[in-house]
């Protein structure tokens, strides 16, 4: 029997509730599809600060590094807002990404038929949308040097540096090309090569790598046009590749095509070692412990983990199918409620998903 070592990081807020749902379904899928998941649970974020004083204990990082995949629920609590930034729960996530050497962030955006009316865009615009934003996570203007604020000539000036190396562009582009090859074979690289030198290097390297992927149709688009096209005609896209700053903005824009942040998973990958799979939503401390959380994003993270991290494609498809069937049957958590639907709590939604498997 195939065995996989999984680290669960429930974290803060609603994290434990949605983690319990994901684990329930993953255990069932293992029995159905002939594999066993060996789970370890470790603290991160606010709960880790409470227990050990650190948002990422060394034991948590070591367990993650030794795993096959990491499933993280949520990090953050207003209780820690008064702490210096480097001591807050969120720094645990940044340290985890660094410790796992993750550089590629994947954000899928899929419009499910049962939720098409949840979007603020017209149904005829978003029907059939199924795209993936691939964002470079560790370079670009967020990390470039020099940066800072200075006083000079009686004025104050602030500056940041947008920089990418050939190596950084090549490794993220390879991730996007491979994803496009496994999907519809279409890749759109987003840059600002008409203005920025760094984008000209980006485009040159993506073009150079395209020679190795003759089965992938490559196009380029300036970021301002891409932002417009995501709203005007999102169906034209399959895989979108872009840098850290542009990807930060475009992935949030694309996410809102769905109409609910409670349905959005993500993955962060490195060249080797385990991937990190986490919902886009936060820890929602205002509803924590009340059985009100929507577990769907966490469940879809589990599906991404099965497909990308563990290569258990049949189980991933089964889990995604259960989500579609439960929504089609009219079951909703409070954040997705609409007329004629049946409202469920987090645990009840988990039971419905289990039955739908």
Swiss-Prot record:
Binding positions for Mg(2+) per the UniProt entry: 224, 248, 252
Pathway: Amino-acid biosynthesis; L-leucine biosynthesis; L-leucine from 3-methyl-2-oxobutanoate: step 3/4
InterPro entries, sorted: IsoCit/isopropylmalate_DH_CS, IsoPropMal-DH-like_dom, Isopropylmalate_DH
Residues the entry annotates as binding NAD(+): 282-294
GO cellular component: cytosol
GO molecular function, one term: magnesium ion binding
Main location: cytoplasm
Binding site for substrate: 97, 107, 135, 224
Cofactor(s) required for function per UniProt: Mg(2+); Mn(2+)
NCBIfam families in alphabetical order: leuB
Family, similarity comment: Belongs to the isocitrate and isopropylmalate dehydrogenases family. LeuB type 1 subfamily.
Quaternary state and interactors: Homodimer.
Protein's job: Catalyzes the oxidation of 3-carboxy-2-hydroxy-4-methylpentanoate (3-isopropylmalate) to 3-carboxy-4-methyl-2-oxopentanoate. The product decarboxylates to 4-methyl-2 oxopentanoate.
Protein name according to UniProt: 3-isopropylmalate dehydrogenase
Species, as recorded: Prochlorococcus marinus (strain MIT 9313)
